[in-house]
């Protein structure tokens, strides 16, 4: 089984948290709301990976004014690729508290939508199990 280290930002701006709705045909949690993030590449430093993933998934315009390592967890997930293939992966999640200076988002094709959500409205979204766990650990659910 392949192992991946995943960097995952919990991005907050003016009291709201950024959620991204995964594409219906790919990813670990197709069609569900999630935090952004992705895998660390070989030789890449952790914060470099976090900033790269944010640029790739959310665009160049989003500015993070603060990044703080927060927690980690692991689990085994099945990832679905755009061509329909599936793979079981051991995932280590490194989760960061992030504050953004703006809300300028341009999502890539991994997502179909995004939303800035007030804490009291987070439970109204179809959150994937990993995001639900993270938000509960933070005291937001």
UniProtKB/Swiss-Prot annotation:
SUPFAM superfamilies in alphabetical order: Nudix
Top EC class of this enzyme: hydrolase
EC number: 3.6.1.9, 3.6.1.12, 3.6.1.-, 3.6.1.23
CDD domains tied to this protein: NUDIX_NudI
Tagged with keyword Hydrolase: yes
Keyword RNA-binding: no
GO molecular function ontology, one term from the record: dTTP diphosphatase activity
Position of sequence motif Nudix box: 38-59
Cofactor entry: Mg(2+)
Domain Nudix hydrolase: 1-141
Keywords, ordered alphabetically: Hydrolase, Magnesium
Disulfide bonds: none
Catalytic activity: a ribonucleoside 5'-triphosphate + H2O = a ribonucleoside 5'-phosphate + diphosphate + H(+); a 2'-deoxyribonucleoside 5'-triphosphate + H2O = a 2'-deoxyribonucleoside 5'-phosphate + diphosphate + H(+); dUTP + H2O = dUMP + diphosphate + H(+); dTTP + H2O = dTMP + diphosphate + H(+)
InterPro entries recorded: Nucleoside_triphosphatase_NudI (IPR023781), Nudix_hydrolase (IPR020476), NUDIX_hydrolase-like_dom_sf (IPR015797), NUDIX_hydrolase_CS (IPR020084), NUDIX_hydrolase_dom (IPR000086)
Protein family: Belongs to the Nudix hydrolase family. NudI subfamily.
Function of the protein: Catalyzes the hydrolysis of nucleoside triphosphates, with a preference for pyrimidine deoxynucleoside triphosphates (dUTP, dTTP and dCTP).
Known partners and oligomeric status: Monomer.
Official protein name in the record: Nucleoside triphosphatase NudI
Taxonomic source organism: Salmonella choleraesuis (strain SC-B67)
């Amino acid at each position: 089984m392949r192992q991946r280290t995943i960097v995952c930002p919990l991005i907050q701006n003016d009291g709201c948290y950024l959620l991204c709705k995964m594409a219906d045909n790919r990813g670990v949690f197709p069609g569900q709301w999630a935090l952004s993030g992705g895998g660390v590449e070989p030789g890449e430093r952790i914060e470099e990976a976090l900033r790269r993933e944010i640029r790739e998934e959310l665009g160049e315009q989003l500015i993070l004014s603060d990044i703080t390592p927060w927690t980690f967890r692991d689990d085994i997930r099945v990832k679905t690729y755009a061509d329909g293939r599936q793979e079981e992966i051991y995932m280590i999640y490194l989760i960061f508290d992030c504050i953004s200076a703006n809300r300028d988002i341009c999502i890539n094709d991994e997502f179909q939508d995004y939303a800035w959500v007030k804490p009291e409205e987070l439970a109204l979204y179809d959150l994937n199990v990993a995001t639900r766990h993270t938000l509960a650990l933070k005291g937001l659910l």
